[in-house]
Amino acid sequence: MKKFFIHIYMFAAAVLLAASCETPLFIEPVGDECQTVLQARLLTSDSLHTVHASYSLHDSVIPADDLTIRCFVNGQLEAETSEAGRMDIEYDITTDKRAAYRFRASIHPGDSVRIEAAGPHGVATARLKAPDAIPVPEVTWDNEIRRTESGSTYSVIRFRINVNDIPAQRNWYRISARARQVVNEYDHSSYPIHEGWYKLIDREMDVDIDNTGDPLLNPDGREVEKWRKDYMANKHNFFTDELFEDGSNVLNLAGLARDYKYLTNMGFASYCDYMVNISAIFDLQSLTREDYLYSRMLEMDNFSLSGIGIVDRLFSEDAVLPDNVDGGIGLVSVRSVTRVTCDLGTFKPDIRSIFDYDNWPPVSPTDL
């Protein structure tokens, strides 16, 4: 079966075969013996990009390690690489099936992009255009104390993000969040390594965002379960402008305060003071329709409700995923990113209770 990631259809075929024991079903391979599969999601906010490449055979998938990848932006060659690696992604069992080609290129909203993969089986080419970028949104926030069923309390940061639609066209979006931590250290020992305040850590981390209070992202208010794929909960926060076309909409999101303040992989000295600045970073991604449909279909795959496979019920025939690779198969997309940073404050925690994140004291003017 020479279709891009149609394991949905193959599963349905296996079910039919198991249910038809009296009549053997023979599947004859069709199409080319070997096809180049390209997958990539390029972001205008990144300078380092990755193209995943495989060879799809009739009975297996293997990494395409012998390609030369070229990236053209507005007709000009931006990058070329023949160095194939692997993505070290925990819990991803498909990493040994894909070669990863990394290159640096500058891509902006509205740019025309062409990705070429040249190898012994010919040249596979993907042509795409970076969508327009969404205007920079206004973000406000406040703290809220919530109570668990057992009566204990915890702190939540509520965000209100006023999104303005790109006018005069249909649009598809996604919002994601990260936390930025800047930790400064003041050494009071007799022989300090650094004089005065010294920047010890400056890092960003992915954080979960709660969309249960937003009717656009999660109309049913479904809570995301950590170990369960739930298409309806929209964990990755995709949305369209269908309900606010050419207008604006306020996204209501929330995050645990401790997720933004969690200080991992560092030690604390009793003779030092620490000052921590916390920021929330939101990326508003503008997608093509094909990228949106592909991403949502991947989320739908394997989603079950009360033991019923939703995909098997919805698709009565082959599920056709978007494909924009000439001379091969796959989907290469580019997303235009609008980034906004929200300062959540600077704190001076006591090292004796530094993990009591909900009660960190804010920095006073005398500490600066």
Model-identified regions with their sequence ranges:
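A sequence/structural signal for flexible, mid-protein segments enriched
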Residues: E22-L368
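C-terminal motif of bacterial Sec signal peptides marking the signal peptidase cleavage site
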Residues: A18-S20
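Bacterial N-terminal signal peptides that target proteins for export
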Residues: K2-Y9
